[in-house]
Amino acid sequence: MSLAFAQRLAGNAPYETLADVRAVVQSQLPALVEGIDKGTIYPADFMRALGAAGAFSSHAEANEDLDLNLAIDAMSEVSEVCGATAFMTWCQSTLVWYLANTENEALKAKYLARAATGELLGGTGLSNPMKSFFGIEKMKLKGKRVDGGYVVRGALPWVSNIGPDHVFGTIFECADGGKTMFVVDCSDPNIELLDCDPFLAMDGTGTYGVQFKDAFIPDDMVLAHAAMPFVKKIRAGFVLLQAGMAMGLIRDSIDTMRKMGASLGHVNKYLTAQQPEDFEAILDELDTRVRDLATTPYETSEAYWRAVVQARLDAGEATMAAAHAAMLHTGARGYHKSHKAQRRMREAYFVGIVTPATKQLRKMLADIDAEGSA
């Protein structure tokens, strides 16, 4: 644990909430990790316990003074133990972020409080839309305006932290190129959840393909009829919240390295630039940078957005590097399926490939820089 994080954990409110989250994580999550990793458990009860502890509610009331640091720190507590569950925590926190920022008061009243407390679970279906905005994919959902709402058809290959009684947010495109962001009720008979092929580390995350069979989306389920201004408002939060997945996994990787010191320190010392103190320095710098950015998630300047994208890229690369170093420090022990080092390595790769992935982040930075020099 970094000194800065330990000091926050020991602090006063609102970090009393963080201590409550840590208590839930430490008492309940370790026993679930193996099943989550194998895909035999979707931890719905644990996610609801996180919500009851306040993990999803610190950013539920949108205002100019809102910051995302408590949500990020709560997620990092989860990530110290299980990267898959931290990803689900991000999905849930992001759903709350959407609902907190919509101007659709009926939708907010229907779902926000329940999502913020964990009573209602759900996720985000923005992987395809986020890629489409940067020319990587085409929009997979198509909608047309009808009386009282829209009819949507198409399919999303992966949406996480969902199930038959869950909801999630996503975007469709109309024939005129306009885009609308909305909330999907997975219990709709015209919405079909499809099982995915096995993943490397995320099979317990409630991840499904989602088929829209001319599903009717009423106006009271619309987050924003004009999606792009809304996306610009929530984009920094969407990306910054993912830092929680990175921070906790890095801390745990550092802890693994330190624990190997007694038995393997005499040889591990030759792992140049891959020592615990190297990653402590990286983590502290990254933590400081993310904390500063997370205090102003509604900033829309290009300079701020570039800094957010850069921080997310650095967080993912640091996570993969730290987990890789932890594997090297554990040696053959970490190569056993029973050792957590190999699981943490698999989870770290996910931080590098979840949208926005490392390659997309690099493209985004290149695009921003090209526009700035034009």
Labelled PLM ranges:
Residues 198-284:
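Glycine-rich beta->alpha junctions and the first turn(s) of the following alpha-helix
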Residues 14, 21, 243-246, 250, ...:
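Amphipathic alpha-helix face/heptad-repeat signature
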Residues 155-188:
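DPxDG-like acidic metal-binding loop motif
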